[in-house]
Amino acid sequence: VPEGETAQSYIRRLCEEGFAEKYRGEKPEYHNQLDYELDMIEKMGFTDYFLIVSDFVRFAREAGIPVGPGRGSAAGSMVSYCLGITDIDPMQYGLYFERFLNPERVSMPDIDMDFGDTRRDEVIDYVRRKYGDDHVANIVTFGTMAARAAIRDVGRVMNMPYADVDVVAKQVPSGPGALHITLDDALRLSKPLRDMYDADPQIKKLIDTAKSLEGMPRHASTHAAGVVITRDPVVTYVPLAKNDETLVCQYVMTTLEELGLLKMDFLGLRNLTVLDDAVKMVRRQKPDFRLEDIPEDDQDVFDMLTAGKTSGVFQMESAGMTGVCVGLKPQSIEDLTAIVALYRPGPMDSIPRFIACKHDPKLVTYKHPALEPILSITYGCIVYQEQVIEIFRRLAGYSLGQADMVRRAMSKKKRSQIERERQFFLYGDPERQIAGCVANGIPEETAKAIYEEIDAFAEYAFNKAHAVCYAVVAYQTAWFKYHYPREYMAALLTSVLDNSDKISEYIGECRDMGIALLPPDTNRSRDGFTVESEGIRFGLVAVKNIGRGFIQNLIRERESGGPFTGFQDFCQRMYDYDMNKRASENLIRAGAFDSLGAKRSQLVAVNDK
């Protein structure tokens, strides 16, 4: 906070400046929302929290570190938008501050931030420098014993032969549908396992013992994203340990939240790095190009997604998502938002109805006309948590905070609260100044049917704020793929250098797109994939046994001493840089010397000598 200002005056000034920049002209309704949020944040005592997040996001942007448009419910906040923490206009997409900070339920705010995965640590380092190493710490996380691991660990302690234990462990169902399966579930689902359990006393003892251990902590590690920032040294509040010279809180994240400590997630998102790399390549021809300036309604981009050309597009490239794109034929970021929200276990069942209603408006029905302005954007289907909140507000007169409390109860299946609220939804609650549907002119039977539908869907409804953020990134990646295919695919290939399956997939996609792939070249390649007039040039990092340090030395030598004139010249100039025979042979076999004229077989023979 600058000298002469309080936290409250400073955040208001920053928000007013951001508001003026984002909304040119009079927007009284929007400004009222900003004032309301600032008052609420001040009353709840979270002003400093927002200033801290705003500060490290500002640092990231000024340092050229890619920052995501937002993540989670924080994108529903006008304050977050005006401070530059998020890039999503909450008013444009109908998002609610109360879904993020609920005045009816005071809890710590939770702003998670996405940064480019290769530079995320720079932001955490900035926070350490700003507040002091002893005021910032990572968070411990415990890996727990899953069903199979528990069987194997217990079998080892019981001195059972590994092969016998392995046979038992492999009877526990695995795969995506068996994630977090318990041994009780496994005994119910796997007949061979049940037969072993019933027939062999030793195996019964093995599984019973494993049952008592599953879910227990097995090992400690550091949480991938969580960081705690404290006013006094962290050791004042929690026990600490060191992991690779980094301070780590010995309490898990939920305990830290219960203690009221300030916890933040700094997440690395590979796709932000891809976009940033693609932008840098485009700027070599168009220096003024900015990602923020791309149009949000490019029909050619949506046509590409409709055609199923989704490989490399954030969130959309799985076979299932591609199928939804082809069926839905998205025409807007709102449509992409719905796809992100619906493609999950549970809501997936309503995708066919959603698609049918989009293409045939006659199929769209509303139990009451008051639902149309709320559900028309999703063709009559309840998709978002924000829609559940709005139904309670508009039809029954709940405040947004009260409505979110009911939505939370429904998502957590708190039946007693759900049944109690049913009466209030229908007939009101004078104590909380809720009028109820009947008093608002909605027939009793209709109101009952609406409540039943909300109850059925609320468990699966998705946070629209988060879906919008990821839909925007999905659209940006699709836009780049369509308009700057070589730059985008080069950046994409560089981002998956450690994943041979993805490299193969994206090389195939390049060929389908008619993009030529050029071999590595000691005189033209850099570390990652790069764009040339003829196509995309392989990066040297893609060549096995070639370290990044050696590549940087090669590039420096090439830039200072000129292009390599032949294999002998290369060997002489790179001799002092720890070049080994294996590395040079791999460069030869990858074609990195082809442009110098000699045949690969000849160079391999020379290299062997």
Predicted regions and their residues:
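Noncatalytic, beta-rich nucleic-acid-contacting surfaces in large DNA/RNA-processing enzymes
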Residues: 1-609
